[in-house]
Each structure stands twice: as C-alpha cells, then as structure tokens.
Amino acid sequence: MFENEDNKTPATCSFCGKTEDQVKSMISGPGVYICNECVELAQSIIDTETKAEAQKDFTNVPTPHEIVDTLNQYVVGQEEAKKTLAVAVYNHYKRVNASLSDDDGTELQKSNICLVGPTGSGKTFLAQNLARILNVPFAIADATTLTEAGYVGEDVENILLKLLQNADYDVERAQRGIIYIDEIDKIAKKSENVSITRDVSGEGVQQALLKILEGTIANVPPQGGRKHPQQEFIQIDTTNILFIVGGAFDGIETMVKNRLGDKTIGFGVDSKQEYDPDKSLMQQIIPEDLLKFGLIPEFIGRLPILTALEKLTEEDLVRILTEPKNALIKQYQKLVSFDDVSLKFEDDAVKEIAHLAIERNTGARGLRSIVEATMRDIMFDIPSEDNIKEVVITKDTVDGKSKPEIVK
C-alpha cells in the first residue's frame, strides 16, 4: 500500500482523487500519484487524437494531376506509368480515409501495384517520390533475400520491420505507409511444371507474401531476425499499407510477342538498336504474361494494377542528367560550389555520359558511377587549390582521354 509519508494516509490519485483502495493499481512519482483508470483514460484520449490526426492527414491527398506535376519535377519520361501510379495512389488513400472515417460500411478493396520495366528505368525512384509527395513512411525490400518460413533467409515480416523503423516505431503511421519490393521477378517459379524439390525462394515466398499484400495482422519481431516463441512482437495491420512491387522480368517481351503471334524474333534481329518495338510490347503486358513468367495466380490477383516502364533512351538520360530539380549534374555543381568553384559540363560531355550508360545497359542507375569516375580526380584536387575558379568537363574527360579544363 502506498502511503503519504506525512500523515500515513493511503495514496490518492492526483487526477481523479480516488484512493489506492478504490483502484487496481497506483503509480507514484515525485509528489504525485496516478491510478490505472486515469492512465487508461489518458491512453484513450491519445488514441482518439491520433486517429483524428491520421484522418486529417489523408483528407488533403493531392489529386492525380498534382501528383504527376510533382513527379515531373524529379522524374523524366514514363508518362503512362506516372499517370497510372498517380490514380492508384490517390484512390488508395481515399480508401484509407474512408476506412478511418467509418463511412457507410462499404468495403473498398486494396489495389497494390506491379511495375514492370528494365533495370535503371526508374521503378524504385518513382515509388520513393510518391512516398515523399504524400509524406508517408517508405521502405524498400529486396525479394531475393526472402525465403519461406523455416529456411535460411529473411521472413516476409522483416519487410514490415523496415517500414516500422522508418516510421520511428509509430505503428499508426507505419500502417499507412508504402512498401516497395524490388526484384519481384526473381521469386518467380523456376518452371510452370510442378517439381518435387522445394523452391524456397520462389513460389514459397510468393505464398508467404499473399497475406500481408491482402491485409492481415502481422506479428513483427522488433529486433528483426527469425521468430521464436519467447519473443515479444509488435502487431501491424497491413490492410492500409500500399505495396508496390517491381522487376525487370527479363524475357517477358518474348512471351508477349508469342502471345500476340509475332514471330519476328531471331538471330537477325538487333534488339539493342531498336527501342520502339520494345516500348509497344511493354505496354501490352497483361497478367497472363506474368503467370507464364512464373508468378502464381493468387499473387498476381493481389496486384491488380499493372503498369510498364519504358526502356530509357539516350535522350532520356541526357534529360535526367540536366532537367530534374535534383539532377545529377546540378548535385555535383552544388558540391564544388562549396569550394567557391563553378562546374560546367559541355553538351558533348553530357551526351557521352548518357551514351556510356546505354552501352553498359545500366539505365539511369549507372549515371552516377560514370559522373563520379569523371569527377573523382578533380574533386580530389579542388580543396587543395585556392586559385581554381571554374572546371569544364569535356567529352574527352568523360572518355578518360584528357583531364578537365581548369580556369584560374
């Protein structure tokens, strides 16, 4: 029994005035007491305010036009994918808002998204920017690290842990975040035929992902790793988490051509020099093609929105280097400006960077490594040289044939 040390009377809750005899438990602090009933009431008030705040966050979701306009500031090209994603995200968060406001009981089903596109076409970048526009927690997972329960590798619940960590362990915020699962094509079944051997990183992972994609209460180990009976879990409802999956799906164009009856593929076709056929084929991908590729029907059913990203051209890469708000060249210009040096890339140099990325088949993802290699030596020298005013990068600099031109 808590007692007041001055008069030896039973402790009294500083908030409601009840004594410890009238409540289940009493928590003491320096000169104050609070009973379990007041703690529960305070928690109820906080929960109500949190829900109201969460509802408020999604009453002003940007319109699809506003989402695309913002994406255009950072992402070059991929107009069809932007439009599809903008509508899907807008409808998703309208659905979230409806579920928070306890509308008329009409249940709106979740529509997760599948992005198909070559390496370096901007799948991850699009998902990242969507999360930034909406100001929601975002996490990226690699499907190739996942295995079904009981095998060495990551459980699918670890994907949710990454989102929870990025939400600073705020479960309410995490439950309305976005998760992007990359390399989803790598967990396709190895063949359409049933095998007696286990496919622990393929179909088994697809099966394990079904529940969290659809919406379930998942038990997430707060420290990650495998589950064990003595471990405490954090429960996360995945119903309002938007899942975006993406993959290159190498070879799917062949499946599309075969389905459409186009048999023009052969040794005489130089696909590296022709982009238009690939673009039209990518836009004609349907769920049937994903099924033939190795995704199981149940998994495809959880991804009702399917959109394709185009292979980036050399012209696209030039624009990516120069146009967006955070364009790569602008980033390096800002870096050297801290040393009071201006940086100029000649037009031919920019085109050569884009050309090398196309040659290496790395898309936009490979641009930074090329620019970094071009800039490394001069960025090493600039801090030690007080008289450098301007650095000019030429085509020969990019090719490694000459050093940058320096103006002093």
Curated annotation (Swiss-Prot):
Metal-binding among keywords: yes
SMART domains xrefs: AAA, ClpB_D2-small, zf-C4_ClpX
Family the UniProt entry places it in: Belongs to the ClpX chaperone family.
Organism in which the protein naturally occurs: Ligilactobacillus salivarius (strain UCC118)
Cellular component terms (Gene Ontology): HslUV protease complex
Keyword Magnesium part of the UniProt annotation: no
Transmembrane segments: none
Identification of the protein by name: ATP-dependent Clp protease ATP-binding subunit ClpX
Subunit relationships: Component of the ClpX-ClpP complex. Forms a hexameric ring that, in the presence of ATP, binds to fourteen ClpP subunits assembled into a disk-like structure with a central cavity, resembling the structure of eukaryotic proteasomes.
Positions contributing to ATP binding: P118, T119, G120, S121, G122, K123, T124, F125
Known function: ATP-dependent specificity component of the Clp protease. It directs the protease to specific substrates. Can perform chaperone functions in the absence of ClpP.
Residue sites binding Zn(2+) per the record: C13, C16, C35, C38
Molecular function GO terms recorded: ATP binding; ATP hydrolysis activity; ATP-dependent protein folding chaperone; protein dimerization activity; unfolded protein binding; zinc ion binding
Gene Ontology terms: biological process: cell division; proteolysis involved in protein catabolic process
Keywords for the protein's UniProt record, in alphabetical order: ATP-binding, Chaperone, Metal-binding, Nucleotide-binding, Zinc
Residues of the ClpX-type ZB domain: 1-54
